[in-house]
Amino acid sequence: MSGLIARAVTEVAQRKAVLEKELPQLVIEILSDLLGAFNPGELLVRAVRHAIERRYNGAEEVCLHVCATQVDMLAREFAGCDGREKRPKVRIETDPTLSPQECVLWSEYGNVALGLDAQMRAALGFEYLSEEGEL
């Protein structure tokens, strides 16, 4: 009986891992079908802007770790974030381990993943479940 339970737990964990990995892309495809094409880079900019405005408005400086292909776009978008008017200074660094849809924001408060995949996992509760070690 314990072997059967162990196999079931393993199978559920494997299925959850596959779902967690593939669900964000599936949601993007469904949204594209419903709303038409959109630029994932624009979504990344919106996610970063949203996080900075809502959570890091009082921070002195934040650093965005992004894929090399996103550096120029994000630098243009956040050129006005210079540390004045309660906006943090935004510094951008390349991280070769990140995909074009990923971004990690580092600040004096800690770091947080801001990419579309990370937001969907958080919204769907995958991160909470992973932290708790539950299935």
Curated annotation (Swiss-Prot):
One of its GO terms (biological process) is protein secretion by the type III secretion system. It is found in: Cytoplasm. It comes from the Bacteria. One of its GO terms (cellular component) is cytosol. The keyword Metal-binding does not apply. Component of the type III secretion system (T3SS), also called injectisome, which is used to inject bacterial effector proteins into eukaryotic host cells. Acts as a regulator of the HrcN/SctN ATPase activity. This is Type 3 secretion system stator protein. It comes from Rhizobium fredii.
